[in-house]
Amino acid sequence: MNLFNIEGKVALITGGYGALGGSISLYLSQQGAEVVIIGRSEEKAAPLINKIKEEGNKGYFVQADVMNVEDLRKAKDIILERSKRIDILINAAGGNVPGATLRDDQPIFDMKIEDWDKVINLNMNGTVYPCLVFGEAMAAEKKGSIINVSSMAALSVLTRVVGYSSAKAAITNFTKWLANDFAQKYGDKLRVNAVAPGFFIGEQNRNVLINPDGSLTERSHKILNNTPMGRFGDLSELNGYIHYLASDASSFVTATVLPIDGGFIAYSGV
């Protein structure tokens, strides 16, 4: 018996064509899951959907804004009509907003309240709403795996990213709350966990970590000096644990939030 087998499972990935979500979507399709990519832009999702199909695997796109409950309900109806069920939900939609990020010498009072609201809405509500809408369908079947994307910034205080960190901390707490609620009300086959990625270079943080000439910024050096593995992560290094949580191999695992950070959070610097 292969505990890691997810062949034929229906896996929803919000933000499934972004850097992180796209890596997960492609990987899960290669493991035999039917991947449903949820996002706002069919045009942006098309190259990934085409690649999935070219490799002989299954995947399709459903348009929805994760911050719009009615959008998500319509998406749920489309998915249940086409795929009949939801086995896996991965909430990969999220990101930072510049106005909710501070310079090292900038007081918090300069933060733009409207951008604080945006980053909280995108990350926190953009995770909670899909859990409620798609989770209802999973609860009806009393089985499935929900995987949220928190952040190492939720577990350790970082300078500058106050809005993003606060939103991800909310996701961490909500993940644990929902896991307890689901297990007690719907049984032990419906699980909720989260991953907390450390530092992975992507489009959103590239300018903060990499200088125009390709050298590392001062912030990057601070990060790497406090990362025992001494390097940034590669997005593909998230896929193994996502696979584990999505499969029956993690059947007794719920309410966990795992840092995937090269040891950053465990290092005191001494």
Regions found by a protein language model. Name each.
Residues 151:
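Residue(s) in the substrate-gating loop at a strand-loop-helix junction
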Residues 33-47:
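Conserved glycine-rich Rossmann-like NAD(P)H-binding loop of the short-chain dehydrogenase/reductase
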